Amino acid sequence: EGKGEININKDGLRDIKHEITKSKNSIRIAILGDSFAEARSVNLEETFWFKLKDDLDSCFNFHKGNEIEVINFGVSEYGTTQQYLTLKNNVWKYNPDIILLAFYSGNDISDNVKYLSQKKYRPYFLFNEDETISIDRSFLDSRPYKILSSPSGQTFIKLSQYSRILQLFREV
């Protein structure tokens, strides 16, 4: 993969700093997605959402003199359930005018079905018999999740960023 410079802003987003309060004369676009949206392998200026802002800035019929602001909420390995939770818990407070979901058919379908996904320790949508949708959070009670969520597990995860051997153990 590429070697993009990664900077995370104070809100935990791979993006420049954005004020929560939207300026009066702006069109705010929120991007949700997985690794394609987070785009860790390229520099910020090379991401599709950074270029989207530049392209829309040159399209006066779209913005009619308003400032275009694009905010990236993409996180690698997120499925649609996690993207929905991000929308609900983080995105709405920024008051976006437009929300774009970056969807990649190569893995986003399997990432959203528990028995197809290799990522077992995340929330999934459940389609109930009464035709309602709920969120399966059973992973919170699993032993592997509890271990990795503990202080020692978090230390292990941080150390594994610097050790191929620890990364191998993490995958097992």
Language-model-detected regions and their locations in the chain:
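Membrane/wall-proximal cationic-aromatic binding patches
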Residues: 1-63
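Serine-dependent acyl-ester chemistry module
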Residues: 105-172
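A conserved hydrophobic secondary-structure block that centers on an alpha-helix together
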Residues: 53-92
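Short, solvent-exposed loop/turn and secondary-structure capping segments
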Residues: 40-44, 82-84, 110-118
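Short, solvent-exposed loop/turn segments at secondary-structure junctions
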Residues: 36-37, 76-78, 104-109
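Structural preference for long, well-ordered alpha-helical segments in enzyme cores
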Residues: 32, 86-87, 139-141
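Conserved beta-strand elements of the Class I
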Residues: 28-32, 71, 99
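Proline-aspartate-enriched helix->loop->beta-strand connector
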Residues: 91-100
